[in-house]
């Protein structure tokens, strides 16, 4: 049975809640001692992982819609992508304001260049920014065929973001490896699309 427009609307409401509720939890954790002895790192990792979760969810939509024969699921993709950008921006902001500090923002540029994992992170964020700014129907009409070409760059983020995560942790743990494996699996589902590009 195919999902109806009404069901998709309710699904969007649930996805908005999924994007917003972690923010409420983070505020609660900050104010009620729910973080570790290094709260700055906790905030950075939490915001980064949440952004990565929404990135993976965004990449899951197309194959899920195709294999489950639920074409209306595509309507949730933009919403998931926007939440991915929101959390990626919170991740970047937490580093700039909490790690460097508001009085040391001038160091941000040199930090991004001198630390390769930060370079990958800012490239990913800039791509997400471009995709967010062009996610409207107006931008899609304006760009025409170039719109799809631009939005295919999300696959670059699917490669860079997990590497950024793997590179940023001092002690390798299963979690970043799992995220990287999931991203690789979602890219592998598109092998036919990639093969067509290389022909």
From Swiss-Prot:
PANTHER family: PROTEIN-METHIONINE-SULFOXIDE REDUCTASE HEME-BINDING SUBUNIT MSRQ. It comes from Salmonella newport (strain SL254). The chain crosses the membrane at residues 10-30, 82-102, 116-136, 153-173. Pfam families: Ferric_reduct (PF01794). This is Protein-methionine-sulfoxide reductase heme-binding subunit MsrQ. It is found in: Cell inner membrane. Part of the MsrPQ system that repairs oxidized periplasmic proteins containing methionine sulfoxide residues (Met-O), using respiratory chain electrons. Thus protects these proteins from oxidative-stress damage caused by reactive species of oxygen and chlorine generated by the host defense mechanisms. MsrPQ is essential for the maintenance of envelope integrity under bleach stress, rescuing a wide series of structurally unrelated periplasmic proteins from methionine oxidation, including the primary periplasmic chaperone SurA and the lipoprotein Pal. Belongs to the MsrQ family. Its cofactor is FMN; heme b. Its main location: membrane.
């Amino acid at each position: 049975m195919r999902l109806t427009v009404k069901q998709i609307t309710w699904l969007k409401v649930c996805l908005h809640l999924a994007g917003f509720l972690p923010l409420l939890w983070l505020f609660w954790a900050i104010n009620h001692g729910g973080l570790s002895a290094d709260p700055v790192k906790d905030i950075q990792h939490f915001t980064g992982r949440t952004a990565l979760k929404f990135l993976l969810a965004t990449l899951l939509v197309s194959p899920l819609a195709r294999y489950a024969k639920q074409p209306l699921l595509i309507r949730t993709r933009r919403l998931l992508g926007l939440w991915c950008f929101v959390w990626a921006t919170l991740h970047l902001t937490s580093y700039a304001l909490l790690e460097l500090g508001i009085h040391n923002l001038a160091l941000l540029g040199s930090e991004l260049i001198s630390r390769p994992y930060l370079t990958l992170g800012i490239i990913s964020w800039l791509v997400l920014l471009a995709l967010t700014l062009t996610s409207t129907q107006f931008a899609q009409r304006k760009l025409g065929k170039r719109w799809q070409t631009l939005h295919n760059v999300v696959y670059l983020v699917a490669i860079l973001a997990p590497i950024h995560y793997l590179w940023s942790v001092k002690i390798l743990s299963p979690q970043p490896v799992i995220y990287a494996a999931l991203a690789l699996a979602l890219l592998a589902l598109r092998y036919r699309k990639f093969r067509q590009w290389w022909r």
